[in-house]
């Protein structure tokens, strides 16, 4: 709908005036013109707004004559309109509002969806200073009866059927919106002329629009289908067509009636106390202050959560990377008191502090500022928690914290380690079993060193850190069943003593195997050497003092031990409750030597060269018993080999043999007799048998 000529002329003048006033820095409305289709509009009055008054007038441009704006008279209300002014910083927010409400339109209009507007007026908002007009805002009001969201919507809401019981798409081949799909005869967008072109080639079945066809298992389908078997009347299904197996075949329920899911329910932020009746596996551990006992943990997304609750009987070993500039020490656990209602008291953690020796293992990319006057700060690099549990309670908590002293302004990346273990209260030590009785995959190989007082140990490999030097490498245990290769670098100078280099290499390699015996089983007793403990076989142990070739040439050493090969023989040793138990039959270590020569560039500078040394672990599985050799029949007639064919005829009666241990033998016999009865009935009801009976009768 266009404006009348006077209003259009006034609009052009106001637009030109507003642009010029903005350039001159005078009062101006932004925007100078508004088309209003709702109950309220707002504009900004910018410039020198001190002492400015705002007035509102309804323009009646009948007979092509517009009234002269009355400035200086405060008039912010009319019979149907009101204007409010909210002051701001060198700006006034001017809001014009319709006072009657849009319900007035629906009460006066019989057709709420009429094409003609309900309100059609022109408003003029004027800003005056010292009784003189300074700026104008022209508002063209054009409001329809159904233009507001507050209008009552029609009750004819489209009901989306539940696709579990009714197909949402009655025409699955209708793939293109607003166009006719060829060969889709159920497409409503196809005209009759187009449908005649491919009526004989329409899609059939569910895709063609027959979304509720009678499926083959219906009893009614057997009466119209030829060649149905004789047993069909006994096993057919009596079901209405509405219960079809094609429901959701093409539409998988992307739109369905909304149901409140569990994660949308209001979540109480207060900690739930699970300790009143004892802990269950997975329950968070509570403190006496009704709060969770938290230790930093790593989420599934890889982020480190500082306030993650500790779950009962859940062990974990995580590492968190933190920027030292953003690091904040957690509240000390010395004051933490764990709730233990079942024992009628409180469990206080026993904390032991140790100083970290090598900071290069924990802090990388370090940058220490020259600020000697600042006091150092203490950071925790490792925290080990041992929880002793008894039934559903916690009886003891032992904590060992490794801390380091760094500069207060030191920068870098710190890697923290947090270990939590739950042990039974009657366990004599903190060592865990690696299986019961056989080893479990991924558990540490248990070892003993009878030459030491504290003889409990394990076999290790290197875990490099930083530059990969052996001086900064840490140890990690050898896990059962995992073949691993690890190594580190030795710094060697051009004037290195070969004998001392061999001693250093042998010492580094021997540090991985600080044991004399390994456990044959995962539950071998550390206190009883005869309880399945095997002595480690050491082959070709080098003599560091022997120099095979005395040479005065610098930068060359022969027969340097550089590789340690650890071979572990394992085998299956029976089964417990159907689970195969594996044990260790022997462990052998063997050294390999290399000839080292200093690598020079253009010139041999006095810089340290790097000698790589490595260690490998190989688990070799051998059969507990030698397999029986194949017979000539098994070699020639492979169709009876169950390992080469999908159908295994020799195992047809396997459930009734003594080798089947899935259930009791008596149950297998009973089920077999029942199956034989069904086969006999099927034989009597079959078509050949009925013919024989008719022939005799």
UniProtKB/Swiss-Prot annotation:
Subcellular localization, as worded in the UniProt entry: Membrane; Cytoplasm, Cytoskeleton, Cilium basal body
Predominant subcellular localization, coarse grouping: membrane
Topology relative to the membrane: Single-pass type I membrane protein
Signal peptide: 1-25
Cross-referenced InterPro entries: Tectonic, Tectonic_dom
GO BP annotations, alphabetical order: cilium assembly; protein localization to ciliary transition zone; smoothened signaling pathway
Organism: Homo sapiens
Pathology noted in the entry: Meckel syndrome 8: A disorder characterized by a combination of renal cysts and variably associated features including developmental anomalies of the central nervous system (typically encephalocele), hepatic ductal dysplasia and cysts, and polydactyly. Joubert syndrome 24: A form of Joubert syndrome, a disorder presenting with cerebellar ataxia, oculomotor apraxia, hypotonia, neonatal breathing abnormalities and psychomotor delay. Neuroradiologically, it is characterized by cerebellar vermian hypoplasia/aplasia, thickened and reoriented superior cerebellar peduncles, and an abnormally large interpeduncular fossa, giving the appearance of a molar tooth on transaxial slices (molar tooth sign). Additional variable features include retinal dystrophy, renal disease, liver fibrosis, and polydactyly.
Recorded name of the encoding gene: TCTN2
Membrane spanning residue stretches: 669-689
Pfam families in alphabetical order: TCTN_DUF1619
All ranges on the Extracellular side of the membrane: 26-668
Keywords per UniProt: Cell projection, Ciliopathy, Cilium biogenesis/degradation, Cytoplasm, Cytoskeleton, Glycoprotein, Joubert syndrome, Meckel syndrome, Membrane, Signal, Transmembrane, Transmembrane helix
Protein name per the record: Tectonic-2
Residues the record marks as carrying a glycan: 146, 156, 391, 497
Highest taxon in the source lineage: Eukaryota
Residues in compartment: Cytoplasmic: 690-697
GO cellular component: ciliary membrane; cytoplasm; cytoskeleton; MKS complex
Record's subunit section: Part of the tectonic-like complex (also named B9 complex).
Primary role: Component of the tectonic-like complex, a complex localized at the transition zone of primary cilia and acting as a barrier that prevents diffusion of transmembrane proteins between the cilia and plasma membranes. Required for hedgehog signaling transduction.
UniProt record similarity statement: Belongs to the tectonic family.
Keyword Membrane found: yes
